[in-house]
Amino acid sequence: MHNIIQRPMAINGQVVIRPMMYLALSYDHRLIDGKEAVTFLVTIKNLLEDPSRLLLDI
């Protein structure tokens, strides 16, 4: 994970500044299929965006 920094984003046709962080995943394609790796990364992204999901296990 990288630092959280303020970056411009287009939201509803407006440019707004939002906190953003890059998240990367490395995996060995001989052991793990790309679909499972992406599914895992999306799950981590969703939990970071809404930690209450992790605490409430939903």
Curated annotation (Swiss-Prot):
Active site (catalytic residues): H29, D33
Entry keyword set: Acyltransferase, Lipoyl, Transferase, Tricarboxylic acid cycle
Keyword Transmembrane helix: no
Needed co-factor(s): (R)-lipoate
Top-level taxon in the UniProt lineage: Bacteria
Subunit structure: Forms a 24-polypeptide structural core with octahedral symmetry. Part of the 2-oxoglutarate dehydrogenase (OGDH) complex composed of E1 (2-oxoglutarate dehydrogenase), E2 (dihydrolipoamide succinyltransferase) and E3 (dihydrolipoamide dehydrogenase); the complex contains multiple copies of the three enzymatic components (E1, E2 and E3).
Official protein name in the record: Dihydrolipoyllysine-residue succinyltransferase component of 2-oxoglutarate dehydrogenase complex
Gene name per UniProt: sucB
